[in-house]
Swiss-Prot record:
One CC-aspect GO term: external side of plasma membrane
Effect recorded for R804W: In a colorectal adenocarcinoma sample; somatic mutation
Residue positions binding Mg(2+): Y568, N797, D810
UniProt name for this protein: Mast/stem cell growth factor receptor Kit
Length: 976
């Protein structure tokens, strides 16, 4: 081995001598000048296969050093010869030989490795608008199509330009900010196949193209000595290389500051520099600057610190502190004041009396550093006796301050005395402010006004000052001897505000003057005016009383906001929000026939175009006011609209579809129910009713006392039965009266659309009644879950539509309750007494439980096929007494025993023992057929707005008022 190595050394020396002699491998140099070393083999590039030997020889007369560079790696060898016995792909790179003179020569070696075509440095950073190198040099220079490709086949940005270099990599030209986080591969074609390198993620360092954005937490600070001064400067830029610092104006002192920073996305950097002086002193006052700069430029912002030894209050009147105002006019006393620390107490005082209202105090600016405030005292219709000193007092934790306004009320003169004759002198005393002037006038006979002055008759005037800020009193006297004839004397007092006169009549009898009397010309006219005015007031009061006694329209549905103790707190419907998404153009409504009308409004059938679809027509019901409606009714209709929008949609309530509140009277658009109200539907179907149970009920007795005997049967005969007269209008029909008709379809065959058959043509059976009971209970459970009390649940307020779907509604203004015998006058309201719970009748209590009572009455209506409850019994004292004593109606003819049991529980005297609507739903579910339940479930699931799960009363109440429980006593509500 040593022999071979020696032979190789000898050969190298020989070659070196030959090269020196011939000088063919190096450029000619001048004698004495050093020359660069030479490398063997004498090529610029050398290609070897992986596993082969790399042998490089550097020849130079003196000392040489080898350097190998690839990517960021550098290796050195101080031998003349560089030998790598088994070449690897990582040995690809530039080999440089340097002599002692610093002259060098290089050769680039490619180690061809088909399994590793790229030498990859995956760190890839680029500065915006500069070139950046993707370092993926090749190990085989003979591959083709050396380029860049996007990851996962994504195309490269259209404006991306690059230059490939097999020895260095691929240079991306003029990097853009949009290239940030761009995923790349280096790519070549080898033997017809595309080969990709490992992926690169390009991270772009943005270039500064604007100065930093700098802001401070406050522009100025005012502190007392010893308080902490803390100010935060926020610097925003595209990268964290922005520089920032706090500086004090005219000072080189290093300030203590803390930094917090974070990135908001890729090119949004934010830094907060907080400057703190733990205990500020007066000499710390000054201007502090937050300075920031980047390569583009600099920006700064300042904040001012003022430190005072203690707090202060400075008051500045906005008007003159001496104020003159005429009697009956208004005046505003306004001050501005600076207060530091913040004011704690402010008040206006007059005559040792503190104003509790009529004034307001507010900061002049919403700026956090504001110390200036405004206080205004509003004096309205000042009287002559209300002049005086009005004082504003303000204080904070350090000082007190006050300012006073002297208010003088200018008053028209008032003549106090004008009929006194003292020692032959006629006196006239007047008071007013400013001081009045008195003139005398005379005219013969009895006149309304005198114009001839008595001057130059001797007139004596005596001024006397009144109380401070009060009226000034002036007394004037005239010698009555100046008057030689019968006549009228006028005393006229005037000042800048106005004038007042008094008249005197006198006459001569012989040589003596008769006692002077006041002028009485206008007394009859004045008395007549007072009488007429009094009569007008009485008429207005009577009309107002009658108007207030007139039953007013109000929304029956009440939404409970919370329960406090024994009181329901209702949401004021006028305060509910109204979303204008419900607005519908008026010109897309075409009105038809009137469906119902009352004293205040009506419901009209209409066609709405484009309500659901842009090109579709839909039949709707529109509730509107009559032209005679008052403001109260207009507000009530708007409240009803807000309540409906608050409740949302449910299959068993009449849902809101839209509204028109702009550009005309309010219109409420709701679903149209083609079969009208359930009460009349039941009465129409009596003769076609198919009963699926025994019809042998006795009809002799309709009432019994359920208070003491809960389980009495129809056959019981006790003193608790009442002898009742037949109903005036409708009574329970007997079996003999009925004419049965054959049903042409079953419930399960119906569809919600009228395409197959009209539901009104079908007969009515017990399954229908159970379905109606179930649906109304579901609807009431939904209202209860929304904390809504109905207050007028009855068959007349249930509508029926396709598929015999029931919908709960409130006719409200569209019902003529004045002519409806179901509504009885009680106080100044008409109430559906026979449907009301005892607590509602006697205590004006409306609760969720009182709705349950009404539901029991509704069930009686339903299973009696539309008969009036308590038939033949008028609402009088006897009725009220029997309700109190526990008398309840017997089961209607067509009610199953289970349904009558539900009615009895709904009529429990103790409201808290009545079932909730959720429990009622569960009870009825056990009785309806599977087909009916299945159909209802399908309809509910197909509804565009499925209702939320219904909650129980106790859960609902606890969710509304935290202090309530399911066992709470009756809750009193005064709003009937």
């Amino acid at each position: 081995m040593r022999g071979a190595r020696g032979a190789w050394d000898f050969l190298c020396v020989l070659l070196l001598l030959l090269r020196v002699q011939t000088g063919s491998s190096q450029p000619s140099v001048s004698p004495g000048e050093p020359s660069p070393p030479s490398i063997h083999p004498g090529k610029s590039d050398l290609i070897v296969r992986v596993g082969d030997e790399i042998r490089l020889l550097c020849t130079d007369p003196g000392f040489v050093k080898w350097t190998f560079e690839i990517l960021d790696e550098t290796n050195e060898n101080k031998q003349n010869e560089w030998i790598t016995e088994k070449a690897e792909a990582t040995n690809t790179g530039k080999y440089t030989c340097t002599n002692k003179h610093g002259l060098s020569n290089s050769i680039y070696v490619f180690v061809r490795d088909p399994a590793k075509l790229f030498l990859v440095d995956r760190s890839l950073y680029g500065k915006e608008d500069n070139d950046t190198l993707v370092r993926c040099p090749l190990t085989d220079p003979e591959v083709t199509n050396y380029s860049l490709k996007g990851c996962q086949g994504k195309p490269l940005p259209k404006d991306l330009r690059f230059i490939p270099d097999p020895k260095a990599g691929i240079m991306i030209k003029s990097v853009k900010r949009a290239y940030h986080r761009l995923c790349l591969h280096c790519s070549v074609d080898q033997e017809g196949k595309s080969v990709l390198s490992e992926k690169f993620i390009l991270k772009v360092r943005p270039a500064f193209k604007a100065v930093p954005v700098v802001s401070v937490s406050k522009a100025s600070y005012l502190l007392r000595e010893g308080e902490e001064f803390t100010v935060t400067c926020t610097i925003k830029d595209v990268s964290s290389s922005v520089y920032s610092t706090w500086k004090r104006e005219n000072s080189q002192t290093k300030l203590q500051e803390k930094y917090n920073s974070w990135h908001h996305g890729d090119f949004n950097y934010e830094r907060q520099a907080t400057l703190t002086i733990s205990s500020a002193r007066v000499n710390d006052s000054g201007v502090f600057m937050c300075y920031a700069n980047n390569t583009f430029g600099s920006a700064n912002v300042t904040t001012t610190l003022e430190v005072v030894d203690k707090g202060f209050i400075n008051i500045f009147p906005m008007i003159n502190t001496t104020v003159f105002v005429n009697d009956g006019e208004n005046v505003d006393l306004i001050v501005e004041y600076e207060a530091f620390p913040k004011p704690e107490h402010q008040q206006w005082i007059y005559m040792n009396r503190t104003f509790t209202d009529k004034w307001e105090d507010y900061p002049k600016s919403e700026n956090e550093s504001n110390i200036r405030y405004v206080s205004e005292l509003h004096l309205t219709r000042l009287k002559g006796t209300e002049g005086g000193t009005y004082t504003f007092l303000v204080s904070n934790s350090d000082v007190n301050a006050a300012i006073a306004f002297n208010v003088y009320v200018n008053t028209k003169p008032e003549i106090l005395t004008y009929d006194r004759l003292v020692n032959g002198m006629l006196q006239c005393v007047a008071a007013g402010f400013p001081e009045p002037t008195i003139d005398w006038y005379f005219c013969p006979g009895t006149e309304q006004r005198c114009s001839a002055s008595v001057l130059p008759v001797d007139v004596q005037t005596l001024n006397s000052s009144g109380p401070p800020f009060g009226k000034l009193v002036v007394q004037s006297s005239i010698d009555s001897s100046a008057f030689k004839h019968n006549g009228t004397v006028e005393c006229k007092a005037y000042n800048d505000v106005g004038k007042t006169s008094a008249y005197f009549n006198f006459a001569f009898k012989g040589n003596n003057k008769e006692q002077i009397h006041p002028h009485t010309l206008f007394t009859p006219l004045l008395i007549g005016f007072v009488i007429v005015a009094g009569m007008m007031c009485i008429i207005v009061m009577i009309l107002t009383y009658k108007y207030l006694q007139k039953p007013m329209y109000e929304v029956q549905w009440k939404v409970v906001e919370e329960i406090n103790g024994n009181n329901y707190v209702y949401i004021d419907p006028t305060q509910l929000p109204y979303d204008h998404k419900w607005e519908f153009p008026r010109n897309r409504l075409s009105f038809g026939k009137t469906l119902g009308a009352g004293a205040f409004g009506k419901v009209v059938e209409a066609t709405a175009y484009g309500l659901i679809k842009s090109d579709a027509a839909m039949t709707v019901a529109v509730k509107m006011l009559k032209p005679s409606a008052h403001l109260t009714e207009r507000e009530a209709l708007m409240s009803e609209l807000k309540v409906l929008s608050y409740l949302g949609n449910h299959m068993n309530i009449v849902n809101l579809l839209g509204a028109c509140t702009i550009g005309g009277p309010t219109l409420v658009i709701t679903e149209y129910c083609c079969y009208g109200d359930l009460l009349n539907f039941l009465r129409r179907k009596r003769d076609s009713f198919i009963c699926s149970k025994q019809e042998d009920h006795a009809e002799a007795a309709l009432y019994k006392n359920l208070l003491h005997s809960k389980e009495s049967s129809c056959s019981d005969s006790t003193n608790e039965y009442m002898d009742m007269k037949p109903g005036v209008s409708y009574v329970v029909p007997t079996k003999a009266d009925k004419r049965r008709s054959v049903r042409i379809g079953s419930y399960i065959e119906r569809d919600v659309t009228p395409a197959i058959m009209e539901d009104d043509e079908l007969a009515l059976d017990l399954e229908d009644l159970l379905s109606f009971s179930y649906q109304v209970a579901k609807g009431m459970a939904f209202l209860a879950s929304k904390n809504c009390i109905h207050r007028d649940l009855a068959a007349r307020n249930i509508l029926l539509t396709h598929g015999r779907i029931t919908k709960i509604c409130d006719f409200g203004l569209a019902r003529d309750i004045k002519n409806d015998s179901n509504y009885v006058v009680k106080g100044n309201a008409r109430l559906p007494v026979k449907w009301m719970a005892p607590e509602s009748i006697f205590n004006c209590v409306y609760t969720f439980e009182s709705d349950v009572w009404s539901y029991g009455i509704f069930l009686w209506e339903l299973f009696s096929l539309g008969s009036s409850p308590y038939p033949g019994m008028p609402v009088d004292s006897k009725f009220y007494k029997m309700i109190k004593e526990g008398f309840r109606m017997l089961s209607p003819e067509h009610a199953p025993a289970e349904m009558y049991d539900i009615m009895k529980t709904c009529w429990d005297a103790d409201p808290l023992k009545r079932p909730t609507f959720k429990q009622i739903v569960q009870l009825i579910e056990k009785q309806i057929s599977e087909s009916t339940n299945h159909i209802y479930s399908n309809l509910a699931n197909c509804s565009p707005n499925r209702q939320k799960p219904v909650v129980d009363h106790s859960v609902r109440i606890n969710s509304v008022g935290s202090t309530a429980s399911s066992s709470q006593p009756l809750l009193v509500h005064d709003d009937v």
